[in-house]
A protein has these predicted regions:
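Non-heme Fe(II)/2-oxoglutarate
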Residues: 1-85
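Catalytic core of non-heme Fe(II) oxygenases with the double-stranded beta-helix
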Residues: 70-127
Length: 127
């Protein structure tokens, strides 16, 4: 089921996340770091290191917006959110066909967590 939720981030939150990501510098790492055995051979992108302060700042903004959004809450029924991950694609980068892993270890709780819901990055895409 696809549920489109427009404008999860208001203009100020979107501008804040974009500014943080634009200034992230060395926090951008090879996206294959979080890819499983199936995804690693076809994943050619960059993502923010989940341990970086910029990741935590962006995660807080996005997670707070999702937690306030009644459409997200009613569609996803989340008990616990995996901290959002931030990826980018420069010229020539791709992410080929693969299946994302359905379970990850939550970095703050150590609990196994289903990750079969994802957010399309349209809100952060440059327009």
């Amino acid at each position: 089921m696809l549920v489109c939720i427009p404008r999860v981030l208001d203009a100020d939150a979107l501008a804040a996340v974009r500014a943080l990501l634009d200034a992230a510098g060395n926090a951008w790492i090879d996206g294959r770091v979080t890819a499983g055995h199936q995804g690693a051979p076809v994943k050619f992108n960059q993502q923010i290191d989940e341990r970086a302060e910029v990741a935590h700042a962006c995660q807080d903004i996005v997670a707070a917006a999702l937690e306030r959004n009644p459409i997200f809450i009613s569609a996803a029924l989340p008990n616990l959110l995996y901290p959002p991950m931030f990826n980018r694609y420069n010229l020539g980068m791709t992410c080929g066909l693969h299946v994302d892993g359905g379970v990850r270890i939550h970095p703050h709780t150590g609990r196994k967590l289903r990750t079969d819901l994802s957010v399309r990055p349209g809100e952060l895409r440059r327009r």
